[in-house]
């Protein structure tokens, strides 16, 4: 019976970190002060890293090889989906620049998502609907490649925007 108890205690000992061990027999002894939520100041990632560089480069390559601007210029006036998507994208980008430039840089509000909780869901919803509109508008050009091409363009723009702040 003692062997089973010793094995169980040994198993339990290694379930917890070494500094969390407190002898249960000595109730009168003060317990060591340990914080379960240790807050470490992590060093922020550099703004231009391999990941963002890849997406920016991929966006440039896609823009060049699929004649993106020529296609957009040809389909600009023919599709109401494209015009509606452009208007929604303009709203989304305007809200994003309002958050980044005005609230964060000019007013100095770091946590604008806490002070103005409706901004981020509205921006996200308008951007998703704009993406759907662009997919519908450009589907006849690239077919099944349209979502992939637009996603690559989106990630390139996001990574380029993230260089701002």
Swiss-Prot record:
- Quick one: which gene encodes this? TMEM128
Q: Which InterPro entries match?
A: TMEM128 (IPR033579)
Q: Would you tell me the protein name for this molecule?
A: Transmembrane protein 128
Covalent S-S links between cysteines? none
GO CC field: membrane
Which organism is the protein's source?
A: Bos taurus (Bovine)
Pfam families listed in its UniProt record: TMEM128 (PF20479)
Bilayer topology annotation:
Multi-pass membrane protein
Segments traversing the membrane:
49-69, 81-101, 119-139, 144-164
Residues in coiled coil: none
The alphabetical list of record keywords is: Membrane, Transmembrane, Transmembrane helix
Q: Which compartments is it annotated to reside in?
A: Membrane
Which PANTHER family does the protein's record reference?
TRANSMEMBRANE PROTEIN 128
